[in-house]
Structures are given as structure tokens and as C-alpha cells.
Amino acid sequence: MPLPPQATKISRNGVELTSNVDRANYLITELTRAAMRDVAKYVLKIVRANVRGINNYTRRMRYASTRYQYWIRKKECDLQLGIENTAKGAETAWWADQSELGAAGQPKRGFLRSAVYDNIDMIRKIEAQYLSAIEDENNAASLVDESENNPEDEND
């Protein structure tokens, strides 16, 4: 579990300079990632509720709603919402791409797109909650979830 970088102290001729730039950059990136994680959970909750009842196949299929997942990439610092095509011990989600984009005999439903576009105001509120905490360092540190840095916890 990485800790935020400590302040850099430079002493010269009795004058001590303290730089918190690295710590501020760390808090900004981690708050951004925490905001993206909560936005993804909110949007996918709506998507999964919409997918469950579209037809008899998805009602019966246990994995129908869990195929929609999110990925938060560390280096790029962005959020991807999408459909994972395979899972351990399950068949492929051949129907998910067709129901999202449309195909012959399958109407375009656009679960992801409509969930995001219909809830832009709520997404802004969620992100504002995290990004307004930048001003207060103690509040920001409490919002950052250090356990998220484990790679096996990234897919929910």
C-alpha cells in the first residue's frame, strides 16, 4: 500500500524550504480516481438494472448484468465502461454487443450510452464531492481508498 510522498525539505544558509508539490499531485490523482470509481459504480448500477429485464434470456442468465464492468487505468488516469466478453466458467456475452449497438434482428438499446447521458447532473455532483475536497488535505486523505491499489480489486 503506497503512502503519499512526504514533503521535500531543503535547507540552505539557515533557510528551510518545504515543497508539497508531490503530495498535492498524489492527492489530486487519487481523488480523481476515487471520483471515477464512484461514478462507474453509480452508472453500472443503473445499467445492470436495465439489462436484467430486457427478455427471458437475460432474466434467466445469472451473468447477464455482471458483463458490464469498469476499468480505471492508473497511467492514463481515465475511466472505461464496457462489456467484458468472457468470464471464468461462463459463456461469452455475444448478446451484449448486439444489444448495445444493434444488429440484424436486434434493436439498438444503448444501455451504457443512455445511462451516462441521462445522469450527467448526478455524475457532476459525485465528482464535485471529491474534487472540492482538494482544498482540505485531511478531508482529501480520508476520501482516498488505499486498498484500491491492489490489481485484483479493480474489476467490480
Question: Regions from the language model: what does each represent?
Answer:
Residues 91-95:
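Hydrophobic alpha-helical transmembrane segments of polytopic membrane proteins
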Residues 1-88, 98-156:
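Short, Lys/Arg-rich flexible segments
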